[in-house]
Every structure is written in C-alpha cells, then in structure tokens.
Amino acid sequence: RVLFRSMRGQSRDYDQWAELTGDAAWRWEHCLPAFRQHENHWRLDAANAAQASAEFKALHGHGGEWRVERQRLRWDILDAFAQAAQQAGIPATDDFNRGTNEGVGYFEVNQKDGWRWNTAKAFLRPTCYGRPNFELWTSAQATRVLTEKQADGSLRCTGVQVWTGEEMVTAHAQQEVILSAGAVNSPQILQLSGMGPAALLRQHGIDVRLDLPGVGANLQDHLQIRAVYKVQNVATLNTLANSLVGKAKIGLEYLLKRSGPMSMAPSQLGAFTRSRPDLPWPNIEYHVQPLSLEAFGEPLHDFPAFTASVCNLNPTSRGSVTIKNADFRSAPAIAPNYLSTPEDRQVAADSLRITRHIVAQPALARYRPEEYKPGPQYQSDEELARLAGDIATTIFHPVGTTRMGRVDDPLAEIG
C-alpha cells in the first residue's frame, strides 16, 4: 500500500497461484472472505448501505480493520482523461476490486476522515499495543537469522541477530521466526545468514548453511512509464504548487477540511486495459496524475501538465538482489533488468501508443494536450521501447526474491 490506494489483484491472478502451487486455498473465491473480513468500506456505512447493490455487498466488507474511502478531491483534467479513455474503448468502473480490474475510474484509498490509514493504525494500536506478549523495537535492524542443524540434516531457526543502533543483541525464538523484510532485505538477511547461492556466499566469506540458488533471484517489479503531456486552460498541481498563494491554499484546505491536494493519493485516476485486443485479461495499468516532474525528488514543472504512467502488470523480465559483502550495513546490489525481454519491450511500445490514442480523443481536445515525454517524433517499436526505459521508474512493487512454491520447486525457499 505504498500509494495508499485500496487495490486487490485480479481473480485470474489468484487462480493462477492456486494452479502453480497446487494449493486451492489461493483461489479467488477462497481469498475473498479474508478481503471482506478485514475491510471497512465507506459504501457500506449506515448512511450509504441502502444504495449498495447486492453484488457489491457480496464482494466487500464492513467493520474490519482496513478503512476504505473515496478520494476527497477531483480534477477537471482527470475527469477529461477518464472520458477520453471511455471514448477510446475502456469502460467506466466505480470498483476496481470486484475480481476484474478492467475499466477507468478514480481509485479508492485507505484513509479515514482525510488521514492516511496504515498498518499501525489499523492493527498495531488497537490489537497489539496492549498485549503482554507484544514488543515493538524501533530503529532496529535484523542482520541475521540464527539456525541450528537438526539430526536429519535440516535447519531450525533459533533466533534473530539485531543491531539496535548501539549494540548487537540476539532475540531467541521459543516457537517460530517470521522473515518479512521485503523483496530487497529478506534475501539480504538470508544471504548474510548463510542461506542462498553457495558461490555467492563463499565469495564473501560466509559459511554456507544452506545452498538455495533462488534466494535473491527472480526479482520482478512494475516499471511505470511516465508519459507527460502539457495542457492549457486547466488547473493542475503544477500551477497550484508553484506559487506561495497556491501553496497556502493547499495547506489551508487540508487544515480546515481534510481535503484538497494534501489529502490525495499521488495517482488519483486509474485504468486497467489490454495492450493487445486479443488478450483475455487486462495486462497494463494506468496511474494518471494531475502533475508532472522530470524525475522523482525533483520539483514540479513550471507549466501545467499531467502524467499518464502506465505499467506492465505481468512483466517477464527478471532481476536479482545480491549482497556486495558480508557487512549488514552495506546495501545489496539490486539489478531489476527492466525491459530485458522482447515481450516487455513490445508491451512498453504498445502502451505508449494506447496512451497517445486516449489523449487524442475529443474529451481532452479543449485542453490542447501536447506530448512532452517521450515526444511525438518517436514512432517505431524500437524507439518507443528505448524511450520507455528513459522516462520510466519503479513503482515500488518488487517481489519474488524469496519465493514460495511447490515442494518440488528447486528455486523455492518454502514448499
């Protein structure tokens, strides 16, 4: 939930997991009850529930930990993009979480009364902070998991080595250790603990506890290709935030109403569609933003513009995460290998053409959109795939480096 959008996967994704693992518990119909149990959807509040359809009630929940609300801000430029997408053949939707994501509409968000709703607020504070068996260490870094070899040759995890910022301490496990440090830090911790590709571990002088070639391999990430269009005669965040008066208005609106740009998700409008008409399911996702910049961390442009980011939902490119030495303080080497397969390059080129097709629709004509990135002079597949890499960046969805799998999968860490 990096962008605090409330988003489930497509039912097809869960069904594929079940097929790949041989475990029917991953199927959509078996995951849906858990989604509903933990959801607290605004459309099922007492004031709104009468308007909710029976189909919606069967897909969503109320009273759970995760608050889901509609966004508290709309933009004319985003409304126009949504209309243009419909004119280009993408249907409208008011619910991306019904099992098929296809359509264009505003994302719903994990907020409560304009405040971001996160894991700490939803789970830790109400259920964990008062428990005698719960202790949270902050500003601490797990450096290694500790293991003992059993009589049958297997390894048993006995604890975790932790750097507190001042000293190294050991947390001993009485029952189990759950490693959940993300797609970058989980493989780093395992490799530092002697579990990973044997050649890599020996290269850095680490005792091989378990040769697991898959640890750190199979890195996958969503690459957002950020097409930027200059516009006229319409407000965007660029124009609002590039003046002291505009910044003051933004701050006051949030202070007084908990609405406005400070309450918004970075990407407010979304769309799921297909890069080719013969595909059975949507394979690309748009995040449309009423703003633009040269790169993350840089100032907004001083001209009005919007960004239509598009990403391949199922990339075939694979990367890796590997330690550079045996020091836990050293960041690992991350090689995402974006756009390294012909399929991913073709999807990238096709996605930029779909963006152009949407922007060329009548609904946006009044704002005179002008392609700023990648630039209308680039037309061939090769040019568009190359420029896609130049204007793209991670959308912070890395997965796959400590993957679960079937018992007979040699690259899985857990079978």
PLM region spans:
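FAD cofactor-binding and catalytic pocket of flavoenzymes
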Residues: 228-348, 386, 391-408
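A glycine-rich dinucleotide-binding beta-alpha-beta segment and adjacent secondary-structure elements
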Residues: 111, 115, 138, 143-146, ...
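N-terminal accessory segments
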Residues: 20, 27-39, 43-52, 60, ...
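Glycine-rich loop(s) and the adjacent beta-strand/alpha-helix scaffold that form part
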Residues: 27, 34, 144-253, 260, ...
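Short acidic (Asp/Glu) and glycine-rich catalytic loops that position anionic groups and cofactors
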Residues: 10-14, 61-62, 325-334, 363-368
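Periplasmic solute-binding protein
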Residues: 4-19, 194
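Conserved redox-cofactor binding core of oxidoreductases
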Residues: 2, 19-149, 154-157, 226-251, ...
